[in-house]
């Protein structure tokens, strides 16, 4: 199918002295997306191919964001995204018992710096990032295995990489990976990708500027309590590990932050999917000497 969307938003700074919004300090975002998706007949009927052309314009006016190197300026993001997916999970999308889900996603911008003679090493950040350039690869896979009747094992593997065409510019401050916590991205303005890792506080496994590569594996044992049309409820236990890194040179795929825990999910057609997880993080939170320990996560909506 074909889809088209246009959106805009404004974010204002909060003046703590007057306890009011300061509209002189603002971030304006406008964007548009044109997309096309289709089901493929080859290699089999479970494949889908989605493509989209996306544009975002960020205008900062005396506005501070931790990942940006400037408070005043404009950044433009024109990217082309291709998503090849395969979904054979069934029989129900709420509680799959068999099959798998795969997605390989590539997101690329034009390599603007190849077409001009600018001295990017000495350019200020607001000019260096006026037209964002990067390429981003994501892989996500899930397998569902029926152990016994309503007891299901869900195995999950993920990988993401954000790269740069020009080392003088470096990796974009936008579109980075933030690992840890419940995985719900709310109030984020820099295109970041938030990855859940239960047993750790939100985004705690990523540096201040954001990661450029991440990987994650998880195993979730699910047991259906009730699967009625009015409400589906299942309990789960999980083991998972993941991490993010500031550069591909630092990437150590087996250096994972590990956790385990249990939770419950409730799906009601009127409210969607709701859940709560209790996770224990076995490893230290970066920048501290403390093991993460017990964390509580509230889940709203389907993940991935």
Where are the model-predicted features located?
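C-terminal outer-membrane beta-barrel translocator/porin domains of Gram-negative envelope proteins
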Residues: 66-225, 237-238, 245-247, 288-289, ...
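Short glycine-rich, acidic/polar surface loops and turns
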Residues: 222, 259-265
């Amino acid at each position: 199918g074909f889809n088209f969307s246009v959106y805009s938003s404004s974010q204002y700074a909060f003046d703590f002295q007057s306890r009011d919004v300061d509209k002189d300090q603002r971030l304006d975002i406008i964007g548009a997306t044109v997309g096309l998706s289709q089901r493929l007949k080859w290699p089999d009927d479970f494949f889908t191919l989605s493509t989209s052309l996306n544009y975002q314009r960020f205008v900062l006016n005396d506005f501070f964001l931790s990942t940006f190197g400037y408070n005043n300026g404009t950044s433009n993001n024109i990217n082309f995204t291709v998503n090849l997916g395969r979904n054979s999970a069934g029989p129900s999308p709420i509680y799959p018992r068999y099959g798998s889900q795969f997605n390989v996603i590539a997101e690329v911008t034009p390599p603007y710096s190849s077409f001009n003679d600018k001295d990017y090493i000495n350019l200020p950040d607001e000019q260096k990032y006026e037209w964002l350039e990067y390429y981003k690869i994501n892989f996500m896979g899930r397998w569902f295995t029926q152990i016994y009747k309503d007891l299901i094992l869900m195995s999950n593997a993920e990988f993401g990489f954000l790269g740069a065409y020009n080392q003088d510019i470096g990796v974009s401050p936008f579109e980075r990976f933030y690992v840890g916590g419940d995985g719900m991205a709310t109030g984020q303005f820099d295109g970041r990708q938030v990855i859940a890792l239960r047993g750790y506080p939100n985004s705690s496994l990523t540096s201040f500027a954001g990661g450029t590569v991440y990987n994650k594996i998880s195993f979730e044992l699910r047991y259906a309590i009730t699967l009625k049309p009015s409400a589906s409820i299942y309990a789960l236990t999980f083991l998972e590990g993941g991490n993010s890194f500031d550069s591909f040179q630092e990437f150590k795929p087996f250096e994972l932050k590990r956790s385990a825990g249990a939770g419950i999910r409730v799906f009601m057609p009127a409210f969607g999917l709701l859940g709560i997880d209790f996770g224990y993080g076995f490893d230290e939170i970066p920048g501290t000497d403390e093991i993460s320990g017990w964390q509580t996560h509230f889940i709203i909506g389907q993940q991935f």
